[in-house]
């Protein structure tokens, strides 16, 4: 670590589980002088590599920023609207604060969402107990837009889902070891 706030990428040899070659800085964060660009997630969507990450720590300046590149091993360009999501402008008394650390999810039917962390203040303070929140994502000019037309997390979110019931062999009195022993469905998991 060289003391700079950067996100790096380096090739991983999956057979030997070792890093190969030199690491390369691909992004320094969206905000000038940003602290803690962290928790990076990489996605390949429509020919671009997207790098989504948190900035500003886990307090009032917490946010989500994104950058993209056609190639993985080159400098990424930032979204012109970065940070693409934050509650920093809503004040400490807003019902949900410290929103950040997002992860994009596509439901297989073309609907996009972001799952993120945030806190609820109690009597003007935050215990920093973070909860998981979900918001809708749309795409404009190749960039994600979180909570379009709303700009903040909502109390409820309508989802296009059907009721799901776990199989009878799953019970609340079992530790479900057999479930966790199974290998992931290769149709659902990819490292490409």
Protein language model regions, located:
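Carbohydrate-active catalytic/glycan-binding domains of CAZyme proteins
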Residues: 1-192
């Amino acid at each position: 670590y060289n003391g700079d706030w950067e996100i790096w990428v380096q090739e991983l040899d999956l057979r030997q589980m070792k890093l190969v070659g030199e690491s390369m800085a691909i992004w320094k964060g969206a905000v000038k002088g940003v602290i803690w660009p962290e928790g990076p997630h990489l996605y390949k969507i429509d020919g671009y590599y997207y790098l989504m990450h948190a900035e500003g720590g886990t307090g009032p300046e917490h946010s989500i920023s994104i950058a993209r590149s056609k190639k993985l091993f080159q400098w990424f360009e930032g979204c012109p609207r970065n940070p693409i999501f934050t509650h920093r402008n809503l004040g400490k008394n807003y019902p949900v604060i410290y929103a950040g650390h997002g992860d994009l999810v596509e439901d297989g039917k073309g609907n996009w969402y972001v799952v993120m962390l945030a806190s609820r203040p109690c009597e003007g303070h935050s215990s920093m107990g973070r909860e998981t929140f979900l918001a809708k994502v749309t795409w404009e000019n190749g960039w994600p837009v979180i909570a379009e037309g709303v700009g903040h997390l909502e109390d409820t979110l309508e989802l296009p889902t059907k009721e799901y019931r776990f199989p009878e062999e799953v019970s609340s009195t079992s530790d479900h070891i057999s479930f966790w022993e199974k290998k992931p469905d290769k149709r659902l998991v990819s490292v490409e």
